[in-house]
């Protein structure tokens, strides 16, 4: 009996060893055979074992068996498991889809996806030219395959698409160093964007993924297991890429994911909000704010009425504070569209928006002030009289300051508000409140503004008020002259007081 038990022990070890061998890339017998062949060609045991592992054929796990790690391993000459050209072996083109029967196309699709998980180093254009071309041609074939009707994608196919895309696009972004994180929009505009050297491959990977997400052959229920929240978060991180081509692709893909995967919609909105919070209140540095706002503009446009409280909170806590950063110019057009969409959907929000603009109104940045005036006109165009009346006093105090600005573009843009018929009607309906607020600014411009265009526009606005309500105009003019006279008297008294103090100081000194 003891002999029988003891006789079984070696077999268990052998079985365990064989099982372990399978875990590491094949049967133990084939592994030892390959290792022996490699050892005869190389004196380095480590390199031989690595070579044996990396020689496994393509298949569902071909990329992992070949030592390729998703998104982490670039093809360079620094690894033990490559040949003299600095390429992982083997890396050869697979047959074309048209050269295999329909029953084999799914398997070939997966093999080609695994082949494309290898990430090449594009910093040296002379390295791996042949292999880079093989990958490019394979990606082109995959794009055509995904775009053509070949039946529903299997779960394995979906998983491998996501793995291949992840291996290629998810990487550490290396932004160009800047001395200051907070730099003005002019400097940002003059700086040329940094283009990713790997774009010849990245572009095709993005194109493939876009068509895959949009394809009717992609089962959303299956795909959401792999295009999950973790994947979406990593996708959002890529929006900070300095390459505008990549951000444009990401914008389209994220919009498609938002439309197709309804389960992810709240998570996507919340994650974008968090990026905005960090941008506004911490870094003031992000390359993808305009693209995010463009996506949100489309989303806001589809909001059902009445608006949910969640969406109103988003307007107040996220969109309005986005007027604060110095680099507003880089995304103002998209932000203004989002803001206007809210007011057009619910005119009662006009008062909230206008007061928000006044809160963040620039004091020392004239070009930013012009942008605020442009946006203000769009908001006022969608504003109804009740909402206008609630905010007109603080609003026209600010407009009066703009009218008196020595920066002619600010004063000119403020005067252009009277060219809008809807805004002019709102002003004239409430002229008894508005004219006394802005009359001093109009009169000073008419008397002594240095810019001829501003002077002419001011006279036109004065004439509009005079023709519509001459009595009110006379009252305002009389009040202005009285205030100016009092101000002159106060100034004269102040000067006389200072003069007496100076004389007193001279007497004491002598």
Swiss-Prot record:
Annotated region Disordered: where? 1-87
Q: Which UniProt keywords apply?
A: Brassinosteroid signaling pathway, Cytoplasm, Nucleus, Plant defense
Instruction: Quote the subcellular location field of this record.
Output: Nucleus, Nucleolus; Cytoplasm
Quote the disruption phenotype from the UniProt entry. Answer: Delayed flowering.
Record InterPro entries: ARM-like, ARM-type_fold, PP2A_B56
Classification via SUPFAM superfamilies: ARM repeat
- Does the UniProt entry include the keyword Cytoplasm? yes
Pfam families reported in the protein's UniProt record: B56 (PF01603)
**Under the GO molecular function aspect, what terms does this record hold?**
protein phosphatase regulator activity
This entry's comment on induction and repression of expression is: Induced by epibrassinolide.
The record's function comment reads: The B regulatory subunit may modulate substrate selectivity and catalytic activity, and may also direct the localization of the catalytic enzyme to a particular subcellular compartment. The holoenzyme composed of PP2AA1, PP2A4 and B'ETA acts as negative regulator of plant innate immunity by controlling BAK1 phosphorylation state and activation in surface-localized immune receptor complexes. Required for the formation of the PP2A holoenzyme that negatively regulates brassinosteroid signaling by dephosphorylating and inactivating BRI1 in the cytoplasm.
The protein's name in its UniProt record? Serine/threonine protein phosphatase 2A 59 kDa regulatory subunit B' eta isoform
Tell me what organism the protein belongs to.
Answer: Arabidopsis thaliana
């Amino acid at each position: 009996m003891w002999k029988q038990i003891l006789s079984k022990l070696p077999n268990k070890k052998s079985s365990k060893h064989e099982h372990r061998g399978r875990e590491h890339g094949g049967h133990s017998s084939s592994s030892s055979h390959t290792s022996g062949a490699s050892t005869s060609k190389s004196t380095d045991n480590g390199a031989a074992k690595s070579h044996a592992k990396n020689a496994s054929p393509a298949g569902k796990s071909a990329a992992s068996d070949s030592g390729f790690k998703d998104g982490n391993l670039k093809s360079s000459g620094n690894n033990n498991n490559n040949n003299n050209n600095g390429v992982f072996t083997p890396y050869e083109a697979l047959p074309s889809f048209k050269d295999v029967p329909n029953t084999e196309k799914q398997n070939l699709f997966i093999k080609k996806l695994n082949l494309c998980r290898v990430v090449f180093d594009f910093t040296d254009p002379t390295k791996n030219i042949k292999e880079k071309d093989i990958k490019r041609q394979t990606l082109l074939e995959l794009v055509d395959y995904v775009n053509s009707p070949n039946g529903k994608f299997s779960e394995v196919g979906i998983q491998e698409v996501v793995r291949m895309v992840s291996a290629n696009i998810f990487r550490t972004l290396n932004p160009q160093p800047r001395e200051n994180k907070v730099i003005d929009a002019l400097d940002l505009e003059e700086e040329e964007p940094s283009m990713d050297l790997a774009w010849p491959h990245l572009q095709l990977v993005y194109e493939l993924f876009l068509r895959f997400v949009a394809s009717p052959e992609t089962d959303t229920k299956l795909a959401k297991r792999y295009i999950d929240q973790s994947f979406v978060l990593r996708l959002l991180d890529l929006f900070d890429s300095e390459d505008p081509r990549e951000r444009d692709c990401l914008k389209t893909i994220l919009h498609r994911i938002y439309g197709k995967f309804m389960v992810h919609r709240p998570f996507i909105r919340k994650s974008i909000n968090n990026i905005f919070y960090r941008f506004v209140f911490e870094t003031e540095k992000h390359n993808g704010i305009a693209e995010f706002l463009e996506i949100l503009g489309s989303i806001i446009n589809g909001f059902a009425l009445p608006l949910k409280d969640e969406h109103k909170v988003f307007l107040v806590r996220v969109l309005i504070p986005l007027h604060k950063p110095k680099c507003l110019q880089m995304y103002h057009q998209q932000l203004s569209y989002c803001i206007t969409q809210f007011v057009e959907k619910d005119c009662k929000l006009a008062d909230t928006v206008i007061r928000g603009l006044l809160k963040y109104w620039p004091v020392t940045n004239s070009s930013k002030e012009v942008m605020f005036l442009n946006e203000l006109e769009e908001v006022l165009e969608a504003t109804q009289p009740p909402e206008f009346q609630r905010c007109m006093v603080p609003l026209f105090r600010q407009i009066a300051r703009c009218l008196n600005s020595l920066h002619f573009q600010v004063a000119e843009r403020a005067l252009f508000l009277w060219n809008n018929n809807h805004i002019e009607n709102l002003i004239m309906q409430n002229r008894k409140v508005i004219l006394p607020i802005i009359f001093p600014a109009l009169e000073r411009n008419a008397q002594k503004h240095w810019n001829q265009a501003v002077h002419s526009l001011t006279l036109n606005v004065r004439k509009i008020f005079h023709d519509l309500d001459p009595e009110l105009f006379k009252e305002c003019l009389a009040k202005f002259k009285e205030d100016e006279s009092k101000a002159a008297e106060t100034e004269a008294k102040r000067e006389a007081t200072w003069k007496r103090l100076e004389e007193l100081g001279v007497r004491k000194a002598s």
